[in-house]
């Protein structure tokens, strides 16, 4: 079995794949803690595996993507000590199913490489891949396939937290789809501002990318909030795939083993 781990700034998502399968048996999301030791991580993952009656010895492969460099050596030691394997770290110099047209390819986040890999292998074509995470990222992949570049905007939750943290009278809120554009209270007004503001951001950037690159790019959505956005405002995405990153990790492990 294969253990895949995607370490984001806010959340860490991980899953278990049976050898050769491209859909995870199990997956889970947890808060990224930068103060964890390798043993704490090992205990955490062992507990997760035992929920599903899987012993550590069943894990024969590991791969991780990370945008938190300080956690990389901790993860690698965890894989070594607890699973007796050398995990593969995602980076731009590994085998990828696409080329990179980018002056400084080392700047591309590992999560963006993983998402692009999943899209290219799933159904070759032209893609705009949107990941709604701590940051809102747009990645553009041509049909060659070639990674052309992207757009990075603030993440929704980061922006909401910044607003309430830097204002005296605005309360923290939970992001949800409002019933109407005009709020009847402070909370409803903030919810409307963020929801419709983010819809405008997504649609506006997609429009500008298509104006520059062509209209025949498919828009693929992933990330923690993609199902909320798609359910409340369908039509932005041609396809949503909350498990895109995990499947991309499985693909890159297969290519680099």
UniProtKB/Swiss-Prot annotation:
Active site as annotated: 111 (proton acceptor)
Residues that coordinate or bind ATP: 6-13, 134
Keywords: ATP-binding, Coenzyme A biosynthesis, Cytoplasm, Kinase, Metal-binding, Nucleotide-binding, Potassium, Transferase
This enzyme's EC code(s): 2.7.1.33
Amino-acid positions noted as binding K(+) in the UniProt annotation, renumbered to this chain: 131
CC annotations in GO: cytoplasm
SUPFAM superfamilies for the chain: Actin-like ATPase domain (SSF53067)
EC top class, as a word: transferase
Assembly and binders: Homodimer.
Family the entry assigns: Belongs to the type III pantothenate kinase family.
Protein name: Type III pantothenate kinase
Originating organism: Leptospira borgpetersenii serovar Hardjo-bovis (strain JB197)
Name of the gene: coaX
């Amino acid at each position: 079995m294969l253990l895949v781990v995607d370490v984001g700034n806010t959340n860490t998502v991980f899953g278990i794949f049976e050898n050769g399968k491209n859909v995870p048996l199990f997956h889970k999301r947890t808060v990224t803690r930068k103060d964890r030791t390798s043993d704490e991580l090992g205990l955490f993952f062992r507990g997760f595996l035992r929920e599903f009656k899987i012993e550590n010895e069943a894990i024969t492969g590991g791969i991780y993507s990370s945008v938190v460099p300080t956690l990389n050596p901790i993860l690698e030691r965890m894989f070594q000590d607890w699973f007796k394997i050398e995990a593969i770290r995602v980076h731009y110099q590994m085998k990828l199913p696409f080329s990179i047209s980018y002056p400084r390819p080392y700047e591309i986040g590992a999560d963006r490489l993983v998402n692009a890999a999943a899209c290219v292998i799933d159904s070759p074509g032209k893609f705009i891949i949107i990941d709604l995470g701590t940051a809102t990222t747009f990645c553009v992949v041509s049909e060659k396939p070639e990674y052309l570049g992207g757009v990075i905007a603030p993440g929704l939750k980061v922006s909401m937290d910044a607003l309430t943290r830097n204002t005296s009278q605005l309360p923290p809120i939970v992001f949800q789809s409002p019933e109407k554009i005009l709020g009847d209270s402070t909370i409803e007004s903030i919810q409307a501002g963020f929801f419709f503001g983010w819809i405008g951001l997504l649609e506006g950037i997609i429009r500008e990318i298509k104006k520059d690159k062509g209209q025949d790019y498919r828009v693929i959505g992933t990330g923690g909030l993609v199902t909320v956005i798609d359910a409340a405002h369908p039509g932005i995405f041609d396809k949503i795939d909350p498990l895109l990153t995990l499947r991309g990790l499985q693909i890159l492990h297969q290519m680099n083993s």
